[in-house]
Structures are given as structure tokens and as C-alpha cells.
């Protein structure tokens, strides 16, 4: 962990707890996987985890995902399955993100307008607390969960891996169940733009052509809660 974090190791005091948690999960996996070749985890991360263990599991989740063991947050079973599919197809680390907010107008004008062929409605911020694998971040820093720290002592919210997501082509994919018990999935192609987010968590400035329409008529209308980012794997995903 120290080698991976390098200068981003801003919370060295929490590393022993995180390391022990990771080893415990790996031991549990080996004890329970049986004949299964592959493993994926839908893990508990809040609100009870940090008060019981004294840290958040985000960094460990990111490391396991980087090992080929996808871990979803908030016991998100369909997110876990989506990550597993993305891992198998791309043969690369994936991450779960929320479609968090639109790109601020001043950021769009300063860093995107005239430089990329996207309208502001084509762009958005993809965010999660800090569960993205380090090799998918431009740089990474160990920090604390700012959202949780609004209601809890900061020292029990340490353990997020934060940084801007590496720019490049991406595929969005999500599998989800509907209220009438049907499986549905969406997929879209786009890119992460080389734009500084000036924010926290694992986060990036994303762009998909016609994202405004896609958001309204697919994500909202069909009740998809969040997204999955992988490497550029759309052709293989269509085969799946």
C-alpha cells in the first residue's frame, strides 16, 4: 500500500487497519469460493461500517478490483454484477460511479468549449467516494470521506482513494432490475476529458454525444441509478 500510494500516502496511520481488512477479505474469499474460479463482492460501506471499524473500505475495494475481484459499494448487487461483466469483457479494472452533477458553466467555458466537440449538455461529472483503482487515476491520494465527515469524526472516515480519472475513451455499462422484475442494461461510448475537476473523491469530467437526451430518455425514464466506467470495450460488450 505504501509503495502504491507514494507521495499520496497522507493517512499512514490508517494503513495497518486497511491492510488487515484486505487480508481478511482475501482469506474469506479463499475459504468460501469453493469450485468457483471468479469472485465478486457487493460490500457494505456505510453508514454502519466506519463506526464499527474506524475507517472506510474504499481504498481496499479499489485494490481488490485492481486484482480482478470487483467490489461494489453499498451492497449494490447489480452494480457488482455489472462490474464483473465489465471486468471479464475488458480484462481490465473497472469502477462504479454516480452521474453526479453537470459540469459548471465556468469550467465548460474555460476548459472544454472550443477545444472539444461537445456541448455543455454532453458533459457531466462522474463521481464516487474513493473506490477507483489507482491505475485508473491520473494521481492518487489517501484521504477521508468528506460526506461522512459532516456527521462523524474525521478520524473514522479515513480510507478513500482520491484523484481525477485518467482521460481516454470509455464504455458506460449498467445492468439493473426493474420494479416489475425485468433485467435491463444500457451501454454508451464516450470519453473522460483531460480537464481538472477541482473536486474530491474518484472523479472525472465525462462526455457522451447527446448525453442530455440519453440521460432523460434512458437513465431517468428507465430507472438506472448509476453507471459503470471501463476501458473502451463497446464492441465486446455488444457481443455479450
Where are these regions (language model features)?
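Short acidic, glycine/serine/threonine-rich loops at helix termini
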Residues: 51-56, 107-111
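Conserved small/polar residues in nucleotide/adenosyl-binding loops
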Residues: 229-234
Amino acid at each position: 500500500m505504501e509503495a502504491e500510494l507514494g507521495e499520496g500516502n497522507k493517512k499512514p496511520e490508517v494503513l495497518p487497519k486497511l491492510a488487515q481488512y484486505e487480508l481478511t477479505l482475501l482469506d474469506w474469499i479463499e475459504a468460501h469460493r469453493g469450485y468457483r474460479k471468479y469472485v465478486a463482492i457487493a460490500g457494505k460501506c456505510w453508514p454502519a461500517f466506519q463506526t464499527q471499524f474506524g475507517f472506510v473500505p474504499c481504498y481496499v475495494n479499489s485494490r481488490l478490483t485492481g486484482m480482478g475481484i470487483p467490489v461494489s459499494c453499498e451492497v449494490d448487487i447489480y452494480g457488482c454484477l455489472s462490474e464483473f461483466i465489465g471486468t471479464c469483457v475488458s480484462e481490465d479494472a473497472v469502477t462504479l460511479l454516480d452521474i453526479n452533477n453537470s459540469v459548471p458553466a465556468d469550467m465548460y467555458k474555460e476548459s472544454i468549449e472550443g477545444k472539444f466537440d461537445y456541448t455543455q449538455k454532453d458533459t457531466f461529472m462522474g463521481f464516487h467516494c474513493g473506490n477507483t483503482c489507482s491505475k485508473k487515476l491520473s494521481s492518487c491520494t489517501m484521504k477521508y470521506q468528506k460526506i461522512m465527515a459532516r456527521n462523524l469524526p474525521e478520524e473514522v472516515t479515513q480510507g478513500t482513494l482520491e484523484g481525477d480519472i485518467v482521460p481516454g475513451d470509455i464504455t458506460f455499462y449498467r445492468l439493473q432490475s426493474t420494479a416489475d422484475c425485468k433485467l435491463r442494461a444500457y451501454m454508451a461510448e464516450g470519453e473522460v476529458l483531460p480537464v481538472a475537476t477541482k473536486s474530491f473523491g474518484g472523479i472525472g469530467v465525462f462526455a457522451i454525444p447527446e448525453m442530455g437526451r440519453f440521460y432523460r430518455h434512458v437513465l431517468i425514464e428507465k430507472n438506472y441509478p448509476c453507471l459503470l466506467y471501463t476501458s473502451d470495450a463497446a464492441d465486446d460488450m455488444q457481443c455479450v
